[in-house]
Regions:
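Acidic/polar low-complexity interaction segments
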Residues: 1-55, 59-67, 71-91, 115, ...
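An acidic intrinsically disordered interaction segment
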Residues: 2-12, 96-106, 153-161
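Surface-exposed ligand/attachment interfaces on beta-rich extracellular proteins
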Residues: 31-32, 170-173
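Short pre-active-site segment immediately N-terminal to the catalytic Zn-binding motif
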Residues: 40, 88-105, 124-126
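Short, glycine-/Ser/Thr-/acidic-enriched flexible segments
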Residues: 93, 119, 142-145
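Active-site recognition of the HExxH zinc-binding catalytic motif
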Residues: 103-119, 132-136, 140
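Post-HExxH zinc-binding segment in Zn-dependent metallohydrolases
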Residues: 125-171
Length: 173
């Protein structure tokens, strides 16, 4: 199945799976006929953000499990973390499938990091705007770019969701 240590990708409540026979030596495998690019992008992005998080918090184990990631949900132009999974809408409304944008995957998993990390400390964090900013920090750290969500919009491949290098908000200025 398209499940690893840190993510279980599902479409229509099903996890992609297939069987292959491996021979001793080098085996060339492809998942192209058994999964789609939305599933593979989500799988790769979640593993990337989990590894990035562990480089800062190696002893934090709150997300050391296969987090469900649901792709191609009904709706459009959004994604969300619900406390137990990350969820991505199908293409529509002028937006690409949100699972295709790695920054969106990093951001949603970032909500999970923030949620589980605060819980591990015995607290909760419910500030909406700050939560969005903190989730963005995980994506910004991975991409090392102030522009998040490039490729989000169908009609503008260079369009983005947020940009942090224009009209900077720096305290105390």
């Amino acid at each position: 199945s398209l499940e690893g240590r840190w993510v279980r990708v599902r479409t229509n409540n099903a996890t992609p799976s297939w069987t292959v026979n491996l021979n001793p030596g080098v085996n060339n495998l492809t998942a192209d006929n058994n999964t789609d690019i939305r599933q593979r992008t989500t799988y790769h992005a979640v593993n990337t953000v989990h590894d990035f998080m562990k480089s800062f918090y190696p002893s934090f184990t709150g997300l050391d499990f296969a987090l469900p990631a649901n792709v191609d949900l009904a709706g459009n132009c959004n994604a969300f973390y619900d406390g137990s999974s990350i969820n991505f809408y199908a293409a529509g409304g002028g937006c690409n499938a949100t699972s295709l944008v790695a920054d969106v995957c990093y951001h949603e998993y970032g909500h999970g990091i923030n949620d589980k990390f605060y819980q591990a400390q015995g607290f909760s964090f419910d500030n909406g705007a700050m939560g969005e900013g903190y989730a963005d920090i995980w994506a910004l750290g991975i991409t090392d770019s102030p522009i998040l969500g490039i490729g989000f919009y169908q009609s503008n491949p260079t369009g983005f969701v947020r940009r942090y290098d224009i009209n900077k908000k720096v305290f105390p200025q």
